[in-house]
Amino acid sequence: MRLVSLLAAFGSILFVASPHSSAAAAPDADAQVRTLKLNELAIKTVENHFLPDGKRKSLSQLTGEMKKGKVAGAPRGLFVTLSKAGKTRACWGSITPEHDDLITATVYTTEAALNKEYRFAQVKRGEVKDLKAQVTVIKAVTPIDSIRAINPLRHGLFVRQGGRAAVLLPGECVDAHYQLVQCKLKAGIPVNSRCQMYRITADVYHK
């Protein structure tokens, strides 16, 4: 099962959008995001990361080139997952926007996955050709009172209790109760205790 890193500051105000907000219901914007092919941009970022000195571009240069002729997308929370043969090699991201647009977020989050991921062995140069990238773009984070409000195949889950918190992305579980238990365990929250729950609505981009 894939685990993800949560970079949202626990003490800050969460980005919470209702199902009727512009972030949750913008089909034209969603169509524009699909044209960005964010998963391909993530792979290009990985390839750039492993180029030798003198050929490797700075992240700002790489981002600038990727933005040419494109609408870069409104800022949203975003996760990048790198996998090999169906197994996660790195995953990083935040449920809240950390960059000005989606292209910038994809590039910098991919680089963070390569440099900051601590649960898996670091990705090596020889693995690049076998890597696949998935980019999960957060559309809404909505408070819920019951797991009945979640379809784990379509929704992610964010749980929080005091300073403990964790995220599971959409599609990581097939059963809502199991999703809640796993998310609590990941956060270090006692399974039988109450906690704040948030449904994550997101679009997932991969090949």
Regions found by a protein language model. Give the residues of each.
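Bacterial N-terminal signal peptides
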Residues: 7-17
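Basic nucleic-acid-binding interfaces
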Residues: 25-207
